[in-house]
Every structure is written in C-alpha cells, then in structure tokens.
Amino acid sequence: MLEAFARFTVRLHEQGICHEDFNQTNILWEYDGTAGNYRFQLIDINRMRFHARPLRPDECMINLRRLSCPAVPFLYILDRYADIRGWDINDTLLRGTFFRLLFGRRQQFKKRFRERKSAAAGKKQG
C-alpha cells in the first residue's frame, strides 16, 4: 500500500498539485482486489493549490511533512518517492526528515503557546 501511495503522491506533485493539508484524514483509499491495486482520493479539496509546473523538490518535501504516520512508514514512503522520481534517496530522506522535524517542532510550539495563553486567560478571570 505504501508503494502505491508513493506513486499516487508522485503523480500529484508531477502534475503540480499540492494539497495544503496533506495528512491521513484527508486521504481516502480502497483496495481493488479485482485489479490488484489501491485507489486513493483526496478530500478537503478547498485546501488544494494547482501549479502550471511540477512541484520543486523542497515543495514536495514540505507537502509530505504533514503525514503523521510513524517514522518507519514515513521513511519508506520517502524512499519509494525518491526512487520513483529518480532522486537521490539519501538526500530525499534527509530533506523529508528535516522538514518533518521542523513541522513537528512548530506544532509543539503552537500547542504550548495556546496552553499558556489559556492558562493566563484563566488567571485573569479568577
């Protein structure tokens, strides 16, 4: 399934399609036993952007960073993605991991900020 998902994502990016909220909750899939393949669909399509060119490598990695799957499947997807695109696998793994870590840190920072803001608002009311 991850191999098929990597191929699906490559096709999107090569066609200049970027889903700004590319995560598991916005990706539907089903296995077609007759054809022996997976089919994927995107939802929440109001967050999609269409470019007249394929996405640049950093744009692709930034788009993939939102996948909140465990590390091993994420790295496998990056590996297959790089192989399908003909990119250097180690470079793709490094870039993808870097952007994912930055995204995770940003999410943690935002969560802590909201918690502190809520705590401060609670003290003012009390």
PLM regions and their residue ranges:
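Activation segment
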Residues: 21, 31, 49-51
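An acidic, Gly/Ser/Thr/Pro-rich helix-cap/linker signature
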Residues: 117-126
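C-lobe/activation-segment region of protein kinase-like
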Residues: 38-117
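Positively charged, low-complexity, intrinsically disordered RNA-binding extensions
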Residues: 22-27, 70, 74
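Conserved protein kinase catalytic/activation segment
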Residues: 26-42
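Conserved kinase catalytic-core helix
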Residues: 1-20, 25
